[in-house]
């Protein structure tokens, strides 16, 4: 119930609407309780005495009661339904914003489909228990308590027969509710698996097709759906048995009530109108009893989903700004790694006692075999992760003491795999700087050698690039990414040079753009191009998480160490035509 209380706290900003809606709900429920009393008078006075004036008066009174109930219920429904949609929308936004506070490690450890399932399926599951469940609880409680008070006053013996129903319903709800909660959580978890497979197949569509794995993926998805169906079928079986069982108990009680009440009418202890009114009140009371049982099962299903959602909200980012973090001043570009260590898993360090320094404005190239730790080192500098030991300083300031956003605003990154949003070219470049003018965007595109091909596109800068930029070539996507970095104008540039095969023209254009981008700023590059290594003031050679060599290209070649070996064994491979080397990372 702790999670449900947390859900109800989401209603606090809208308490005025909730209070007004509750008042109208109480009024609607109260008018409903008055109707059987008028029905009793209709039978005992009008039907027996055949009084036409009383008939008209009672008919008008009942009509007015129904009209009042209609108006009050309509206002209540509007206020509560609008509030529910607003609260759920706010909750989705809250979840989305929380995801953006999470560190990279959170997404590395979890599959995309699981996160998406929580944001969609789980939120939908809790939607009806946020306002609808409390409203139903209030409405049915008024009907139940009000009805019991009235029938006790009318006939306590008949009341006792009606109330026998309560323990049986409570027992049913408790037994079946627990099972439904477990199954609901199980279903959500299994749906997350199928959502993950679906997301992977959409994003990796070309890979699936090229390897002709349609049947394999279809089988994976079918098995995941079938698995969730099995759990859903169990829930359906329980629900299918639960509903009719409640109806059977209620019908049996009504049958006994009719039998005993009929005897009371025959013996003259109660009037026919009182029996009819009593049966109507018994129906009103039985409704809440059955409703409470159904509400309990709905609550258990919602709690299963809310558990997964609050698990997400309660997860704290492994990398976050300290409470007293300082705002990063304008960065000059000095970088220091001081005995820095890092591990993804305990007892398995991937960065081992790395120490080096970079002067402002220097270009440093990182080279080494695959798995050497180059990408991890870059992530530590970007502060996607924090070192497990040692320290990283920028301009002499420890990164752990810096407010994250103030640091990230001054860091630019061009990743090896260019990520574009499925929007226009203009939006993708402008993403680097809020309020960038058209002139600034065009200037950045020109500096990245992208303006010419953009102007050849059907809608030029307004051209939609498709999901992840699929409508553009690899070289065009890279130039858009470079333009974005140029527009940001970062103090420190982090560049993971792409290894994808490009035509000679694209290669030359990209190289020119990168050289412009790296001018007059500190640049840390995972290098794959010979020109980048030759232009670097310092080359750091990494192997097994440590820096094993450093110096210029000529100095490292003279040492005849790992760098020399990589070069001569063609793991660093000179491309005579495209002025390119490749390092497998």
Residue positions per predicted region:
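An intracellular "coupling" helix at the cytosolic face of ABC transporter transmembrane type-1 domains
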Residues: 13, 104-105, 121-130, 134, ...
């Amino acid at each position: 119930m702790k999670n449900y209380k947390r859900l109800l706290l989401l209603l606090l900003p809208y308490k005025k609407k909730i209070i007004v809606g509750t008042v109208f709900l109480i009024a609607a429920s109260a008018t409903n309780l008055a109707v059987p009393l008028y029905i009793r008078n209709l039978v005992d006075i009008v039907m027996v005495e055949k009084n036409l004036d009383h008939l008209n008066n009672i008919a008008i009174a009942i009509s007015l009661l129904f009209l009042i109930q209609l108006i009050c219920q309509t206002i209540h429904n509007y206020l509560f339904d609008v509030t529910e949609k607003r609260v759920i929308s706010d909750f989705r936004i809250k979840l989305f914003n929380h995801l953006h506070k999470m560190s990279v490690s959170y997404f590395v450890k979890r599959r995309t489909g699981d996160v998406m399932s929580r944001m969609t399926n789980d939120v939908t599951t809790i939607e009806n228990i946020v306002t609808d469940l409390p409203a139903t609880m209030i409405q049915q409680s008024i009907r139940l308590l009000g009805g019991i008070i009235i029938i006790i006053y009318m006939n306590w013996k008949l009341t006792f027969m009606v109330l026998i129903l309560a323990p049986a319903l409570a027992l049913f709800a408790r037994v079946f509710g627990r099972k439904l909660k477990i199954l609901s959580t199980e279903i959500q978890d299994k749906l997350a698996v199928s959502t993950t497979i679906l997301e992977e197949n959409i994003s990796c569509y070309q890979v699936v097709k090229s390897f002709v794995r349609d049947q394999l993926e279809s089988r994976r998805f079918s098995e995941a759906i079938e698995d969730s169906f099995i759990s859903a079928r169990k829930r359906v079986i329980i629900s299918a048995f639960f509903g009719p069982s409640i109806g059977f108990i209620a019908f049996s009680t009504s049958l006994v009530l009719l039998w005993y009440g009929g005897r009371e009418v025959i013996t003259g202890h109660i009037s026919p109108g009182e029996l009819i009114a009593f049966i109507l009140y018994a129906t009103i009371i039985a409704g809440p009893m059955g409703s409470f049982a159904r509400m309990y099962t709905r609550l258990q299903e919602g709690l299963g989903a809310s558990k997964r959602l609050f698990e997400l909200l309660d997860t704290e980012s492994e990398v976050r700004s300290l409470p007293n973090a300082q705002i990063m001043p304008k960065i000059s570009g000095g970088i220091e790694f001081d005995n820095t260590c890092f591990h993804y898993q305990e007892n398995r360090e991937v960065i081992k006692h790395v120490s080096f320094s970079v002067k402002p404005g220097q270009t440093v190239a990182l080279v080494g075999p695959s798995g050497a730790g180059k990408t991890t080192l870059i992530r530590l500098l970007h502060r996607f992760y924090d070192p497990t030991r040692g320290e990283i300083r920028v301009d002499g300031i420890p990164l752990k003491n810096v407010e994250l956003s103030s640091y990230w605003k001054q860091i630019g990154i061009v990743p090896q795999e260019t990520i574009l949003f499925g929007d226009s070219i203009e939006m993708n470049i402008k993403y680097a700087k809020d309020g960038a003018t058209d002139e600034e965007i065009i200037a950045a595109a020109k500096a990245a050698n992208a303006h010419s091909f953009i102007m050849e596109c059907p809608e030029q800068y307004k051209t939609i690039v498709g999901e992840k930029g699929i409508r553009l070539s690899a070289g065009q996507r890279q130039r858009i990414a470079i333009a974005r970095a140029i527009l940001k104008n970062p103090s420190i540039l982090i560049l993971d040079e792409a290894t994808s095969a490009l035509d000679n023209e694209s290669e030359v254009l990209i190289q020119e753009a990168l050289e412009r981008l790296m001018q007059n700023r500190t640049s840390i590059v995972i290098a794959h191009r010979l020109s980048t290594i030759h232009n670097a003031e310092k080359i750091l050679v990494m192997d097994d998480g440590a820096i094993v060599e450093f110096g210029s290209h000529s100095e490292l070649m003279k040492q005849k160490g790992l760098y020399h070996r990589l070069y001569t064994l063609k793991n660093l491979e000179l491309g005579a035509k495209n002025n390119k080397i490749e390092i497998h990372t």
